[in-house]
UniProtKB/Swiss-Prot annotation:
Protein name, per record: ATP synthase subunit beta
GO terms for cellular component: plasma membrane; proton-transporting ATP synthase complex
EC number of this enzyme: 7.1.2.2
Enzyme class: translocase
Gene: atpD
Length: 470
């Protein structure tokens, strides 16, 4: 097949119009390449993806890297296929960019197998319907909003409440305990955090079981809008061809939407609510429907979701909500109390918080914990106006237990050891259930509430109380 060439007719930021000869237009999602001397001295080093057909034998494309240095009339080569990334075991331990090139200066991937980044979601008949919980070792999550194996989990939170730290702790806990392969997509987040994660994984010895795909804040919107799809293709290969249970971490899914909205305006689409792209729900659906479990293997995904201005009704987080099996909501009020992870125990939900999945004992304790915390929340207005003395004896007891529960929901993290100075704790589910059932039963009413702060198991809280008493 003879090579198809076109030429640049217009450059508008990250969007480039290319003219072709009549009858030779590349289809939507096809990859094109052009030489940009501002990137490096390689030929055809900039990848474009066809987004629209404009008529007049022209296509509108989105650039995957910087367009500074491009000029009208430059030659563009049609690659004859969509953007493809290397897949398979050679990607493990490596950092790739959106087009599957290594960016860790450790030489080429040297892989023969590639997957396109736009793929169909698995058919209904091939999807798995098995439901089981998996343990993360984080008390508040395992007790109140447990994660499903092969499910989709969202970590919601505003700026600076600890989403990335929680994701890094989950990688640390699950990747070490789980033993399978992990894929991490860094979508429009800080490059420093990406670097920290790489170093962290290297030190803890889980790097050789993980593939990292980065398109960070400094990348153009085209790369940020596609990098999650590149990572997903790598995860799909492990699920479909190797029958693995894969973990997919995405930090941050909001940046995927944000990049889509940046590009959408340049493509000439009329914006919808709050200035987002009109195709918001479709784009989110195309990504999320591919993250699923089949009868060959599973993809369990944990996605950090930035909440603009702490408003959960913003279209970006609200659209993501519909796809999730469990939501872990991080709250600024709880972070201000110094309780980390700052998970809101009343706002966080899980589809599998159900006695048929997690058992009667776990379900009963979780509901009692939520009841006590809700009662405390309801009493806070009275306490603020009249003080604790005006409460009945029964309510005073509820408040005391609620404050202990609140403190006991905190936990020292392995990845934060350098900042907190206290060693991280992984708490088994049975220990979590035992601890909270004892607090609710009133076995530890005599201990000071400070004893429950930043400990793992209830035994550690008792030990801490003895030290405090000295």
């Amino acid at each position: 097949m003879s090579q198809n060439f076109g030429k640049i007719s217009q450059v508008i930021g990250a969007v480039i119009d290319v003219e072709f000869e009549p009858g030779k237009l590349p289809p939507i999602y096809q990859a094109l390449r052009v030489t940009n001397p501002a990137i490096d001295d390689q030929e055809f080093n900039l990848v474009l993806e066809v987004a629209q057909h404009l008529g007049e034998n022209a296509v509108r494309t989105i650039a995957m890297d910087s367009t500074d240095g491009l000029v009208r009339g430059q030659q563009v080569k049609d690659m004859g296929k969509q953007i493809s990334v290397p897949v398979g075991k050679k990607t493990l331990g490596r950092i790739l960019n959106v087009i599957g090139e290594p960016v860790d200066e450790m030489g080429p991937i040297g892989n023969e197998k590639e997957y396109g980044i736009h793929r169909e979601a698995p058919l209904f008949v091939n999807q798995s319907t098995k439901v089981e919980a998996f343990t993360t070792g984080i008390k508040v999550v395992d007790l109140l909003a447990p994660y499903a194996r092969g499910g989709k989990i969202g970590l919601f939170g505003g700026a600076g409440v600890g989403k990335t730290v929680l994701i890094m702790e989950l990688i640390n806990n699950i990747a070490k305990q789980h033993g399978g392969f992990s894929v991490f997509a860094g979508v429009g987040e800080r490059t420093r955090e990406g670097n920290d994660l790489w170093m962290e994984m290297k030190e803890s010895g889980v790097l050789d079981k993980a593939a990292l795909v980065y398109g960070q804040m400094n990348e153009p919107p085209g790369a940020r809008a596609r990098v999650a799809l590149s990572a997903l293709s790598i995860a799909e290969y492990f699920r479909d061809e190797e029958g693995q249970d894969v973990l997919l971490f995405v930090d941050n899914i909001f940046r995927f939407t944000q990049a889509g909205s940046e590009v959408s305006a340049l493509l000439g689409r009329i914006p919808s609510a709050v200035g987002y792209q009109p195709t918001l729900a479709t784009e989110m659906g195309e990504l999320q429907e591919r993250i699923t479990s089949t009868n060959k293997g599973s993809i369990t995904s944990v996605q950090a979701i930035y909440v603009p201005a702490d408003d959960l009704t913003d279209p970006a987080p609200a659209t993501a909500f519909a796809h999730l099996d469990a939501t872990t909501v991080l709250s600024r009020q709880i972070a201000e109390l110094g309780i980390y992870p700052a998970v809101d125990p009343l706002d966080s939900t899980s589809r599998i918080l159900d006695p048929q999945v997690i058992g009667d004992e776990h379900y009963a304790i979780a509901r009692q914990v939520q009841y006590v915390l809700q009662k405390y929340k309801d009493l806070q207005d009275i306490i603020a106006i009249l003080g604790m003395d005006e409460l009945s004896e029964e309510d005073k007891l509820v408040v005391a237990r609620a404050r202990k529960i609140q403190k006991f929901l905190s936990q020292p993290f392995h990845v934060a050891e350098a900042f907190t100075g206290s060693p991280g704790k992984y708490v088994e589910l049975k220990d979590t259930i035992k601890g909270f059932s004892e607090i609710i039963a009133g076995k530890h009413d005599d201990l000071p509430e400070q004893a429950f702060y930043m400990v793992g198991t209830i035994e550690e809280a008792i030990e801490k109380a003895q030290k405090l008493a000295v």
